[in-house]
């Protein structure tokens, strides 16, 4: 078996720690990504070779109305209610993404816990019933367009070229409100993939 990478995810702490003072977040980034050694020969960091970026669904803007009690399990969203994108969102996560690139991380993976709240069946970033995808039936194409727009923006504007995208994170789970998330059954996965 060949291991493709040694990775970690920015969910959920990076949205906050990426906004900390520069010396603190740079130290954290060194601990995560650095391949260098200190003068005594000890490693500066664990040298992750891949970094996973959580594309938030927008539950943070809903606050307690999101149905997600823990603010650390909510995410900002790039898609706005008027259909525009605010690429300034998820600033803490974007900082760690750039820090990973600057420190030589070789692979980047984007993943989605929930489609944007503007596209979900219940206007929330979690499932009500845990039985089916929390994506409106008429939003499958829009969801694909959203993901494509995300990838193009990060490549064209930030020079981050994601190697992989995971549009369905842990689809077998119910995701009924502990954090952003959506279940997907096999037919829904197939339909979304065909789009």
Feature map (PLM): residue ranges:
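N-terminal catalytic cores of secreted or lumenal carbohydrate-active enzymes
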Residues: 1-163, 167, 175-177, 182-190, ...
